[in-house]
Every structure is written in structure tokens, then in C-alpha cells.
């Protein structure tokens, strides 16, 4: 029998957000345990400073073992802190609630603050997978792995990015589902804590331990994009929504600039491991910034915390709606899972998003990930290759603004097709030039601008488009699927790299990325509906989702 929640008074902004999740003491106690456990890994890393910070073959010291135990305890306690009680009842309640940003509401200072925090969150999040390209050369050298500089090593260095990117695919799907019923803010908080704990990958002495921690790091990183985009779709007014979300998602390019700069400055002095250890302060920063991220109003209403929800909706110009995305009163809907995305009326758009996501993944992890390695193979030093990548990404940052304007002005469908075609054209330049581009540094840098920057904006466009396209109850899942597919292409190409004797050259990786992008652009033009400046329920209505009744079997998670 469900208990009727007591009547609430409207809380202050600070009091409302301080509450955050169900068991704050458990969460923050767990966070302290995790942080202490991570810090206990640093003495072993520092002790290897006279050996170039090489830890291969070293046995974990007592401090590291104690740290691992503390991290395990802390993660369990923190998970208990964010999990709501009566989860089955909450799942039923949350599907009845619909929250929509007012289409004509002005951008307020709360929106600006939220967008700023989301930009930082996305940047920190994307720094994880983008670090892989700069970690692999040093990682391969320390462990004697098969790589362009050591073709006779074993096993393949590509195992590290393969495991990490596989983790991001899994994370996108898991976190998308989790955030749809447990709340956006709680999900972001726990993902941020995982950012801190998985940074111990930089202190792991064993090859297998590195792979395990990289997998966990990928799972944590894979969830941030679908959560943040779902939250922005619910709080940003329709007339500003698309362009702003693409602009924030374009911080992927900024993350590449920051990561390449850090690699050039720090790796020569502190080894490749420092790129993972940077996750400690950046993860803590993300936890601190979450004070300015509101909880999902629909989650608060489902928990009986209506006063808090109404206060948040008033600040962000949102409302609770009864519309085509809402089941009729008194109807208990079936559980909406990922299978729902593969049924009419979402099958066509989901197919287009999937094909485009796979193409983007092949570019990002078939070409972009191996740029530092391939530049070193054709004669660049590790430092020079990092600077070349950084400069190209830095010059390409204005492309993010251009892509956001295109999305806002012409809509998602056409801008995604144009940006995909432009990226494919730049990749064709690498197919034609090949290794000879090593002698033409200016041409090389110019060609790198588009795949390093434009493809990041395409990822943002896909996530923004998915967050607008799918109804509220499957929004984070839909965005999670889109984000996961942009990584799934990477899993495919990395699996090929692991099985091949050598990492593919720059010409091969460019060709692998260019072909599916062209196919994806055409597919998207044919099947993708337009979402430009439209209310979320209007998009659902035109898709044919009005009164959609989900089959309990097909829609089961």
C-alpha cells in the first residue's frame, strides 16, 4: 500500500538542492572513503619516479591494497546513497510524470549557469576517452606490447582502447536507463565519483589491472553525455535548445585540445600514467559543480517532493504537462525499455541514428584515436605529434560555433548530413596524401582540423537530436543509445586492430571512416524527421507516438 507523502512547503534553492538524493550521509561517506582510497595509490606511483614512473612488475604495496578496499566500500555506500527506496513503485510513478520546458521562455541566469556546468562536465567526461590516443604509445612501451614501434610485442596495445571504448558503450546504455527513473542529478553524482575512483588506473602495476580499470573508467565516462543532454532537453526552451546543446556538446573538441596540451606538457616528465591520475582533481571538481545542477522535476514529483519540483520548474521556466506523451489518467503504462526504440514509430529514426553513430565511431576511434601513434610512425616525436594534434584541434574550435549555428538555423537533419559529408571530404585528403603528408606539415594540420573538430560536433548533434526526438520516459535511453552507437563503431575497428599484426596506417584509417560517413549522411536525409525549434510533445505527436501503448513483452527492459 503506497504511503501518501506529507504536504511540503516550498524549500529554498540551497535547501532543495542540498537534499539531492535519498541518503546523503551514505553517499558523502562513501565519497570520502573513495577519495581516501584513491590517494593511498599515489605513494607507489611516486616511489617509481627514479624509474621513469614505470610500475610494471611491482607488487602492490600495503597502502594500495587498503586503498582498494576503501574504494570498494565507498562505492557500495555511495550507490546506496543515490538509489531510491521502493524502486518498483518509483518506476511506475515516474512514467506518469511529464515535464516540458516552456517553448517561448527566455534564457535565464539559471539556464546560463546550468549550461556552463554542463560544458565543464562534458569536457571532463570526454577527456577520458580522448586520453587513450596519448596513453597508448607509452603504455605499449612500458609493457612491451605490439604497436607500430614494436611490431613483435605481445599482446596488442589496442587492447587498452578496445576495453575502454567497450566500457563507454556499456556505460551509455546502463546510465541512460538508470537516469530515466533514478534522477539525473543522482546519476551525474555517482558517475563523477566513478571518475575519481577509476583514475587509479594510473597507478596500476599490472597489465590486466590496467585493462580492468580502463573498462570501469569507460563505463563511468559513457554515461555523462546521455544524462546531461536529457537534462538540457527538459530545461532549455525550444527556441534555444538545439543550438545550445550542440554548442555544449562541441566541448568534445575543447577536451581534445586540453588533453593534447597536457600530454605534451606532462607526459615527458611524469609518464603516460599522469593522464589517468588527472582524473582525481577533475572528478572532484565535477562533484563540487553538481551543486548547480538541478534534479529532474519528474523524479522529484514521483518521490512525493512536489514542492521541490515546482520550485525548480519555476526557476527554469518549465511545467508539468498532460499531452500525447502522457498515458491516460488511471492507466499504468508498460515498462519502456530499449526495445521500445526499435519499434514503430521510432524504428526509422533509431536506424538513422545508429548508422550515423557507427560512422562517427569509426572516424573517432578508427582514425582520430590513432593519429598520435601514426604521426610517430611516420617520423614525428611523441611531443611534436601531441603539438600537431593540439594545434589542429585548437584552430578547429570555431567550427563548434559554426556547427551549433547550422543546427539552430537549418535544423538537425540537414546540418548533420552536411557536417558528415564535410568530414568525409577531409578524410579523403588523407586517403590521397597518405604518409607523404609528413613532409607537408601545414597541409597535415589543415586536414586534421575537420576530423578532430567537426566530428566532435557531429557527436554532439546526434546526442542533441536524440534528446529532442524521443519521448520523456525513454529520452535518456534514446540519448544513451545514440551516444553508445558513436562508440560502437570504435569497438568494431579496435577489434580489427587487435586481430591484425599492425595498427592500420593513416590512409587506411581515413578510408574506413570516410565511407560509412557518406552512407550515414544519405540515410539520415532519407529517414530523419526534423526537430528544429519544436516542442518535445509536438515532435512525438508527428512521429505517431500519440497514445502509444507499449507491449509489455516488447518494451520490457
Residue spans for each PLM region:
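Intracellular cytosolic loops and amphipathic helices of Major Facilitator Superfamily
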Residues: 1-14, 46-50, 67-104, 292-346, ...
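Extracellular/periplasmic helix-loop-helix junction of adjacent transmembrane segments
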Residues: 54-61, 135-169
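Extracytoplasmic
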Residues: 39-45, 113-147, 364-372
Amino acid at each position: 500500500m503506497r504511503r501518501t507523502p506529507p504536504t511540503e512547503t516550498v524549500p529554498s534553492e540551497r535547501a532543495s538542492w542540498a537534499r539531492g538524493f535519498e541518503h546523503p550521509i551514505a553517499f558523502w561517506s562513501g565519497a570520502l572513503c573513495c577519495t581516501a582510497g584513491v590517494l593511498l595509490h599515489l605513494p607507489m606511483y611516486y616511489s617509481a619516479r627514479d624509474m621513469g614512473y614505470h610500475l610494471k612488475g611491482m607488487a602492490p604495496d600495503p597502502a594500495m591494497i587498503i586503498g582498494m578496499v576503501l574504494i570498494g566500500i565507498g562505492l557500495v555506500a555511495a550507490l546506496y546513497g543515490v538509489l531510491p527506496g521502493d524502486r518498483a513503485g518509483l518506476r511506475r510513478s515516474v512514467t506518469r510524470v511529464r515535464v516540458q520546458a516552456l517553448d517561448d521562455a527566455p534564457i535565464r541566469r539559471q539556464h546560463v549557469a546550468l549550461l556552463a556546468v554542463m560544458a565543464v562536465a562534458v569536457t571532463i567526461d570526454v577527456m577520458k576517452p580522448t586520453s587513450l590516443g596519448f596513453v597508448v604509445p607509452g603504455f605499449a612501451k612500458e609493457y612491451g606490447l605490439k604497436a607500430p614501434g614494436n611490431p613483435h610485442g605481445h599482446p596488442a596495445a589496442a587492447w587498452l582502447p578496445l576495453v575502454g571504448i567497450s566500457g563507454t558503450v556499456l556505460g551509455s546504455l546502463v546510465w541512460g536507463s538508470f537516469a530515466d527513473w533514478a534522477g539525473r542529478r543522482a546519476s551525474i553524482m555517482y558517475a563523477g565519483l566513478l571518475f575519481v575512483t577509476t583514475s587509479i588506473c594510473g597507478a596500476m602495476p599490472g597489465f590486466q589491472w590496467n585493462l580492468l580499470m580502463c573498462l570501469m573508467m569507460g563505463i563511468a565516462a559513457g554515461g555523462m553525455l546521455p544524462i546531461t543532454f536529457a537534462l538540457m532537453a527538459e530545461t532549455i526552451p525550444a527556441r534555444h535548445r538545439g543550438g545550445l546543446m550542440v554548442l555544449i556538446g562541441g566541448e568534445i573538441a575543447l577536451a581534445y585540445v586540453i588533453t593534447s596540451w597536457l600530454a605534451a606538457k606532462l607526459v615527458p616528465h611524469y609518464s603516460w600514467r599522469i593522464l589517468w591520475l588527472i582524473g582525481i582533481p577533475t572528478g572532484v571538481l565535477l562533484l563540487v559543480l553538481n551543486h548547480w545542477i538541478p534534479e529532474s522535476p519528474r523524479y522529484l514529483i514521483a518521490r512525493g517532493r512536489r514542492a521541490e519540483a515546482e520550485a525548480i520548474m519555476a526557476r527554469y521556466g518549465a511545467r508539468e504537462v498532460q499531452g500525447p506523451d502522457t498515458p491516460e489518467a488511471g492507466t499504468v503504462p508498460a515498462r519502456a525499455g530499449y526495445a521500445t526504440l526499435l519499434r514503430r514509430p521510432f524504428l526509422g529514426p533509431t536506424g538513422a541514428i545508429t548508422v550515423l553513430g557507427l560512422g562517427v565511431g569509426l572516424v573517432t576511434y578508427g582514425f582520430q584515436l590513432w593519429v598520435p601513434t601514426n604521426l610517430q610512425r611516420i617520423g614525428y616525436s611523441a611531443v611534436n605529434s601531441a603539438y600537431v594534434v593540439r594545434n589542429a584541434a585548437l584552430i578547429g574550435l570555431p567550427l563548434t560555433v559554426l556547427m551549433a549555428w547550422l543546427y539552430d538555423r537549418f535544423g538537425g537533419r540537414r546540418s548533420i548530413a552536411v557536417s558528415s559529408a564535410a568530414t568525409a571530404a577531409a578524410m579523403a585528403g588523407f586517403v590521397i596524401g597518405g604518409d607523404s603528408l609528413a613532409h607537408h606539415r601545414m597541409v597535415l594540420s589543415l586536414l586534421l582540423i575537420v576530423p578532430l573538430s567537426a566530428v566532435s560536433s557531429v557527436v554532439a548533434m546526434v546526442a542533441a537530436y536524440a534528446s529532442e526526438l524521443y519521448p520523456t520516459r525513454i529520452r535518456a535511453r534514446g540519448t544513451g543509445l545514440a551516444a553508445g552507437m558513436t562508440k560502437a563503431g570504435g569497438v568494431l575497428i579496435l577489434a580489427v586492430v587487435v586481430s591484425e599484426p599492425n595498427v592500420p596506417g593513416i590512409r587506411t584509417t581515413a578510408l574506413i571512416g570516410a565511407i560509412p560517413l557518406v552512407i550515414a549522411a544519405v540515410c539520415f536525409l532519407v529517414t530523419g524527421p526534423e526537430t528544429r525549434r519544436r516542442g518535445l510533445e509536438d515532435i512525438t505527436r508527428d512521429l505517431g507516438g500519440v497514445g502509444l501503448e507499449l507491449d509489455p513483452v516488447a518494451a520490457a527492459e
